[in-house]
Amino acid sequence: MILTAGEGTRLAPLTDDWPKTLFPVGDRPVIAYLFDLLKQYGIKEIVLNLHHLGDLIRENLGDGSRYSVRISYSPEEELLGTGGGVRQASRFWGEEDILVINGDNLLELNIERLILYHQASSAAVTMALKPMGAHSDYTPIYLDQDSNVVAIEGKKRSTPGYAFIGAQVITPAFLKQLPRAGPACLIKDGYRKLLRSRKDPGQIKGFITTGYWREISTFQRYRDANRDFLGGRSPFYFYRWREEFTRRGLHVGKDCRIGPRTNFRAPVYLGDGCEVGAGTTLGSMLLVGARSSIGEACGLQDVIIWPDSKIRKGSHLKEVIVTPFGKIKTG
């Protein structure tokens, strides 16, 4: 299951018009990378919960055939939170354990090892965790010597903590401990409640991974994910243009029209069908989505341009996200 019902309030006003899981990173929506990850491990039956802009998600993803997956939808009349959303959708998998991933995640994760690790324990939940950096602002999670989660706290201890990367395996027995109706949070109403009960220290296991992870819950994190893509630090930049981009720091998609005296400052990515007016300077750190139009005599630096967007003649933009609905200053 991929959690896609949230409102994404920290990314407003972008999320007023477009659901977070469909935000482009590089040349694809975030959720497309999650589909790819799941398919690597033979997982093609996927449930999405829907609430905020759910019709747009359904309209853009359909039955999933474009991504070689099969999507089922669990619409929520009221926003049920992470726990309530999984609880309601559990009719799709019955008494089986379920892998649940946040829909705003970009991650490298060995799902096979995660599942085997979970199955080898008697845990109700197994959380995928990554060692925290010294200046991380994520809520620290602490483990004992047996990799049991012992604390999910808002303050750091002297011992190293871990960040939860938004992927977990959950048992049906755990879901039955959540409130039976209404909104519920997996962490607040589930994991922390289990920890407070102190019945069994092995009820929540931590699976440690060191692979790539970004989530796009804020403007800064969304920009960082796209900078990783442009800078070659992301494992998701390996599609059809990897060799060319690695060599030149420049990708020009199919059917692009580039005006005379255009100046490129790498790294620059132009999606298919883009149009660039004469005398424009592109870059550095510029990502232009497919079918976008940039007028003459523009200067663009550290800009993310969504597909089907338009930049007026003579525009000079820096640290901005441009969408078909408008532009947002992020720096």
Whereabouts are the PLM-identified features?
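N-terminal nucleotide-binding beta1-loop-alpha1 segment
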Residues: M1-D16, Y41
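Conserved N-terminal catalytic core of the sugar/cofactor nucleotidyltransferase
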Residues: I2, P24, R28-N102, E108-R113, ...
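Active-site metal-binding loops of divalent metal-dependent hydrolases
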Residues: E7, D104-N105, T262
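A structural signal for short hydrophobic beta-strand segments in well-ordered beta-sheet cores
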Residues: L22, I141-L143, Y191, G206
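Catalytic-core segments of class I nucleotidyltransferases/pyrophosphorylases
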Residues: I43, D97-L99, L106, E112-Q119, ...
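Short internal beta-strands
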Residues: V47-H51, A128-L129, I304, I321
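A short, conserved acidic/glycine-rich loop-to-beta-strand motif
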Residues: S121-P131
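Structural signal for interior beta-strand "rungs" in well-ordered beta-sheet cores
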Residues: E244-G331
